[in-house]
């Protein structure tokens, strides 16, 4: 076939391939190699007419896959030629770089891409994207026809160069040059962001290929900054990806939101709070990493519920972690409740909700959910649910019997399959047995349950500091102080140095042994081990120990230090973040107790005005406090105002009928009055006090006074026994309750 007989489009295609090969050689080869390849090209041109039917312009040695790649890129080149009448240097490099990248020749591709003058073509690309083809941007030609100003670069060329910049970033990434890769990738976003600001939205989003490259670049940039060990730039890139209008599809946006939330939670880099350019007044602005992550994950869950994105269980896992460390488990429970029913099994939902409410301090709500679970015949979480229910019941004296039943069922379900769960079950069983012993009707039953509870605890995992701490607590409350001290020390050895309650118990046991200096040494050691915000309870105990040693001025000084700490703590947290409900309650209780302790000190010093001042501060915190009304009654009693004292004690019992100090104080005043007809009332008050707290030495002492007032021989004998019990208990009484 002669050259004249070859169809024009075939000749055009052959010339185009030849041009591409020459440009490719210029990009990849040295000068000598280039001359050698040009000679080969001339030889191949001589036989082009003869060989056309049986071969193509490509070498027969090239693989079929390479042919497909070249054909695709030639089509790109032809499209560029149609739009601009020429294929310029940058576009040719973009095409050839893509060919090398697709073949896996990363270093060769990078050499080609580095030949593109990015700075030189940036302005042209921005101009091409911002040109509008509407009427107000058109101009009149001489013939009166309306023509659009043609940009220096076509949209297709812009798309081609965007892809080249993106592939350059990917090449740098694969070669481990992450900083350069991120800077290259950022160029795409900078160009588009500037163009969008000038109203080029339709030009960007209207081109499918360009939008696809932009989406990939937006998603890649934060990952590159993370690889470059630049977390702050990664955070800024994530925010840029989510706050700008890139027209990303929902799934891509969801992926970016999830990855950003994960980075905020686990990277260890504290992000600066976002400075939002446009926000409605009163809108929520996250103040730290956790809040920002929670916001992102909650948005993702809402999209899942609205079926805008597919379900991803990891979202819920990360949100559970974030809300747990934020101390807002009630909010986590709400998120679970709002999930679509088909996403979670009903039994799993109830079990998770019960965990949330238990962690939030709403044990009774959790128990109600668990009771619903137990009605199911087949529940995979049954054993763990039984243990949780038993623990909840064990913390409430009125539900101890129910908790005992749950614990025994859990042990029965386990058998010998899981030693760890068996140890946990025996731990919970020990707690419920010792708690239920307090409600025992007879002394025999009480002792039997206490003994069984101790045995259950000792059969639990004795390498667990929580188990050993519980044994120390039970022995301390039974006044087995030597055993309690040994267990408390063992708990510290097992790794409970960070557990404030173990330090407190150890110091309280020492104070019960009247070793006040040793107890203060333990408190000082604990102060060195704990953080500043956790020192409140330790400082209060230290003040009580100093008071027990007769160091009243030092005790008042320590209380003043504690109040200053509480004031600073309250202001700091109020300005920084929302506190968990339980923590706020604990702070208020600690401040309230401090004012009450100071009031007692000033009453003993007969400084009535100072005592009244402390009680006034207490009233501001809790207007209806049985403890405060009891202290007011003590103040009136010390001043000889018995009627006012009786009224204060009565008010305290109206607020809390089980307030033991008010029961004993009211009985004491009735005994002082000396009305024999009131003996029955005194007896009822004291017996109720001992039913609630059988180790209260003041109740035993006043009961002895009551028997002595009766005057009979048998009553005198009972009085002696009561006085002996009171003395024994007072000798082993800690400066503050063991729990």
From Swiss-Prot:
Gene3D superfamilies in the record: Tetratricopeptide repeat domain
GO molecular function, one term: calmodulin binding
Composition bias type Polar residues, residue spans: 53-63
Keywords recorded for this protein, A-Z: Calmodulin-binding, Repeat, TPR repeat
Basic and acidic residues composition-biased segments: 33-45
Top-rank taxon, per record: Eukaryota
PROSITE patterns: TPR, TPR_REGION
Annotated GO CC locations: extrinsic component of cytoplasmic side of plasma membrane; membrane microdomain; plasma membrane
Stretches the record annotates as Disordered: 32-71
First and last residues of every TPR repeat: 90-127, 162-195, 215-248, 465-498, 500-533, 536-569, 592-625, 626-659, 697-733
Record's keyword annotation contains Transmembrane: no
Pfam families, per the entry: TPR_16, TPR_19, TPR_8
Tissue: Expressed in pollen, flowers and fruits.
PANTHER family: PROTEIN NPG1 (PTHR44102), PROTEIN NPGR2 (PTHR44102:SF12)
Quaternary structure, from the entry: Interacts with calmodulin in a calcium-dependent manner.
Protein name: Protein NPGR2
Gene: NPGR2
């Amino acid at each position: 076939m002669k050259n004249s007989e070859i169809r024009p489009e075939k000749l055009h295609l052959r010339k185009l391939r030849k041009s591409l090969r020459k440009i490719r050689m210029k990009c990849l080869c040295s000068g000598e190699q280039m001359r050698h390849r040009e000679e080969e090209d001339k030889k191949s041109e001589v036989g082009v007419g003869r060989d056309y039917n049986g071969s193509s312009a490509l070498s027969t040695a090239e693989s079929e896959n390479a042919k497909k790649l070249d054909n695709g890129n030639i089509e790109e080149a032809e499209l560029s030629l149609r739009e601009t009448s020429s294929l310029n240097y940058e576009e040719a490099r973009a095409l050839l770089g893509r060919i090398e990248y697709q073949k896996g020749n990363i270093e060769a591709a990078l050499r080609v891409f580095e030949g593109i003058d990015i700075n030189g073509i940036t302005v042209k690309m921005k101009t091409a994207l911002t040109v509008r083809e509407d009427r107000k941007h058109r101009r009149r030609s001489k013939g009166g026809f309306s023509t659009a100003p043609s940009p220096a670069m076509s949209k297709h060329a812009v798309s081609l160069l965007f892809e080249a910049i993106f592939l350059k970033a990917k090449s740098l990434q694969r070669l481990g040059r992450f900083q350069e890769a991120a800077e290259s990738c950022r160029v795409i976003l900078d160009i588009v962001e500037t163009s969008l600001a000038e109203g080029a939205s339709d030009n960007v989003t209207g081109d499918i290929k360009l939008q696809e490259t932009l989406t990939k670049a937006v998603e890649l940039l934060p990952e590159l900054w993370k690889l470059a060990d630049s977390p702050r730039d990664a955070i800024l890139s994530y925010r840029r990806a989510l706050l700008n209008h890139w027209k990303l599809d929902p799934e891509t946006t969801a992926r970016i939101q999830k990855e950003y939330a994960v980075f905020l939670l686990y990277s260890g880099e504290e992000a600066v709070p976002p400075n939002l350019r446009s926000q409605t007044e009163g809108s929520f602005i996250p103040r730290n990493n956790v809040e920002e992550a929670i916001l992102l994950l909650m948005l993702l869950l809402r999209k899942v519920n609205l079926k805008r994105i597919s379900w991803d269980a990891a979202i819920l896992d990360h949100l559970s972690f974030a809300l747990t460390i934020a101390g807002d488990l009630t909010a986590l429970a709400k998120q679970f409740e709002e999930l679509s029913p088909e996403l979670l099994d009903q039994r799993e939902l109830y079990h998770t909700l019960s965990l949330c409410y238990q962690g939030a301090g709403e044990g009774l709500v959790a128990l109600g959910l668990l009771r619903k679970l137990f009605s199911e015949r087949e529940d995979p979480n049954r054993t763990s649910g039984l243990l949780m229910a038993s623990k909840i019941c064990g913390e409430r004296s009125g539900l101890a019997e129910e908790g005992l039943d749950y614990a025994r069922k859990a042990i029965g379900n386990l058998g010998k399959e899981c030693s760890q769960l068996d140890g946990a079950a025996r731990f919970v069983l020990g707690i419920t047995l010792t708690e239920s012993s307090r409600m025992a009707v007879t002394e025999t039953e009480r002792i039997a349950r206490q003994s069984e509870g101790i045995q259950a605890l000792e059969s639990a995992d004795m390498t667990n500091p929580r188990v050993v701490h519980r044994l120390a607590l039970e022995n301390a409350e039974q006044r087995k102080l030597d055993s309690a001290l040994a267990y408390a020390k063992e708990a510290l050895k097992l790794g409970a140095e960070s557990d404030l309650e173990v330090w407190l118990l150890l110091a309280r046991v020492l104070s019960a042994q009247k070793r006040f200096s040793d107890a203060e040494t333990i408190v000082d050691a604990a102060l060195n081990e704990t953080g500043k915000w956790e020192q409140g309870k330790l400082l209060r105990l230290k003040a009580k120990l100093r008071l027990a040693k007769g160091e009243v001025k030092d005790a008042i000084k320590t209380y003043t230090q504690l109040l200053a700490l509480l004031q600073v703590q309250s202001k700091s947290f109020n300005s920084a973040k929302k506190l968990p409900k339980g923590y706020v309650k604990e702070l208020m209780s600690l401040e309230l107790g401090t004012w009450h302790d100071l009031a007692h000190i000033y009453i003993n010093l007969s400084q009535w005005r100072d005592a009244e001042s402390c009680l006034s501060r207490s009233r501001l915190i809790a207007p209806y406090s049985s403890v405060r009304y009891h202290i007011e009654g003590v103040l009136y009693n010390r001043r000889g105002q018995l009627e006012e004292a009786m009224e204060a004690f009565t008010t305290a019992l109206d607020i809390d009928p089980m307030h033991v100090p008010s029961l004993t104080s009211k009985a004491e005043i009735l005994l002082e009055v000396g009305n024999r007809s009131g003996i029955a009332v005194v007896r009822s008050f004291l017996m109720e006090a001992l039913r609630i707290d059988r180790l209260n030495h003041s109740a035993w002492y006043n009961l002895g006074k009551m028997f002595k007032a009766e005057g009979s021989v048998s009553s005198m004998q009972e009085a002696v026994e009561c006085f002996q019990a009171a003395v024994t208990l007072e000798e082993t009484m800690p400066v503050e309750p063991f729990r």
